[in-house]
Each structure stands twice: as C-alpha cells, then as structure tokens.
Curated annotation (Swiss-Prot):
Family matches, as SUPFAM superfamilies: NAD(P)-binding Rossmann-fold domains
Family, per entry: Belongs to the NAD(P)-dependent epimerase/dehydratase family. HldD subfamily.
Encoding gene, per UniProt annotation: hldD
Spans traversing the lipid bilayer: none
Function: Catalyzes the interconversion between ADP-D-glycero-beta-D-manno-heptose and ADP-L-glycero-beta-D-manno-heptose via an epimerization at carbon 6 of the heptose.
Positions that bind NADP(+): 10-11, 31-32, 38, 53, 75-79, 92, 143, 169, 177
Pathway(s) it belongs to: Nucleotide-sugar biosynthesis; ADP-L-glycero-beta-D-manno-heptose biosynthesis; ADP-L-glycero-beta-D-manno-heptose from D-glycero-beta-D-manno-heptose 7-phosphate: step 4/4
Protein name: ADP-L-glycero-D-manno-heptose-6-epimerase
Cofactor note: Binds 1 NADP(+) per subunit.
Species name: Haemophilus influenzae (strain 86-028NP)
Amino acid sequence: MIIVTGGAGFIGSNIVKALNDLGRKDILVVDNLKDGTKFANLVDLDIADYCDKEDFIASIIAGDEFGDIDAVFHEGACSATTEWDGKYIMHNNYEYSKELLHYCLDREIPFFYASSAATYGDTKVFREEREFEGPLNVYGYSKFLFDQYVRNILPEAKSPVCGFRYFNVYGPRENHKGSMASVAFHLNNQILKGENPKLFAGSEGFRRDFVYVGDVAAVNIWCWQNGISGIYNLGTGNAESFRAVADAVVKFHGKGEIETIPFPEHLKSRYQEYTQADLTKLRSTGYDKPFKTVAEGVTEYMAWLNRK
C-alpha cells in the first residue's frame, strides 16, 4: 500500500494520478473533506481507501499498523501563506509531520514530504543552505522548521526521507484552493466571465519559478523509485514573469487585454517578488528530465480547465 496525505488536495491528487498511471491503485488517501468540493479531485482516480486526517494521525500516534506500506507521500498541510494563526499552523504542519516521520522511520518506510520555497523568503539565492533561508510568514516558518528537524535526523535514518521545496506550482486539480490557486487559474476564470485578465501593479518586475504540477508529481515518483534522501528544490530553475503567464492564457483564449490592479496592502513586505530554484542538488541525484516552460505548461493547463 501507498499512503498519500493531502491526497484530495492539489499536489496530492496529482501524485495519486501519477501512481495510477503506474498501475498502482492500492492507495490510502488521507485528507480533510470538510471542504466537500475537494472530492472532485478524486472522482477520476482509483484508490483503495480514504481516512480523515485526524483519525489517521490518532492511529499513527497509537502505533496502529496499516499492513505493508511501500511509501508515504505527505502532502497534507495548511498551505495558505496568508494564515497567521501560528498555533494552528505549527500543530497542523509541524507537529503532525513529526509524528508521521517517526512512524515511518521506526518501520523503515520511505517518507516523501512537501516543503516549500517559502522557506527562503526575501533572497536572490535559492539554494538548499541555511544562510539563504529566512521565511516571511508563519507558513514558511513551519516548513523551514520541519526541514531543520529532518536535517538533524537524516544521518541516522535507515530509510529514505526526502523533502521537496515546491516553488510556484500550477496545473490541474487546484480548483478548491480559492484565493491561493495559481495566477493562471484566476486569469482563466476572469476571461471566462467576460473580464480582462488582471495583474497586480508592479508585477512586470516580479518573476517567479512557475512549475507544472505534472512535473512535480513526476519528481516525487522518480525519487521514490530511486530511494533518494535529502531536501531538494522543486521548480524549473527558470524565473518567468507573471506577464508570461497572462500572455499564455490570453493566447489560448484568443481574447483579453491585460489590465493592472493595485497591489494589496496586506501583502506588502510579505510577498516574494522573485523566486528561481537552484536545481544543482536535484540534478545531482540523476534526475535529468526537462521541466515545462510557462508557455508549455499553461497551454496544457488551459486545455484541461476548458475541456468539455
């Protein structure tokens, strides 16, 4: 069996899809379906069982057995960079992850987890080293602290433990994320409503490493298949502009004039204007597949979003 936490969420459901594509259906999805709309991410996927996240962690803490587990992909977390309830974030993202990590270490179960580029903060260098890490929000801090925890236990680990610092992920199955969904998702919705696509004023100076979710899932699967341990950036290695995203959306629809709107006050000083993954460490594992450009990935995503 394979366990995917956050399996009804954005990246988790794409990992389930990638596992299905390998012929694996013996998958336990762990999630919180209080937001019932997330069920839609699982409708076309094959899984063996579902468990609520609180029931699951209670079983983990109790030491319950789930049979033979080939791997755990831990994608479940509060991923809202705008959430400022630190007690909730640390419990949900940090303590939960530690419990699951130790369960896997004790049983030598390969453990792959979602970290984030939010661990870096305001830097021009995105390399997996302490000197470049300085999160700007409590979400980023929760991910940073778990990475630090993993770094300390890695030398003693007898089974793979692998964290991925996701950059700006976009693509299918993010519909439930609301305001935290990708720019491409929001621009598509604006055009469908007959509006012009809108970018924040000043965004011509913002550049992000936008990575397609299919590529993210592929790296997770490859690292599992190859027994990789460590903490790795997962982006494309190239920063592209928000304008490039908008251009790809407009080109797909064949209509729309890009407009600018004021930059929100509450995001100032808490917003990464530039991200670009240094992929040196990931490439050193032997992973050599190319990543989709914004033009390629957004076009594929638009086709998925607008399928009949």
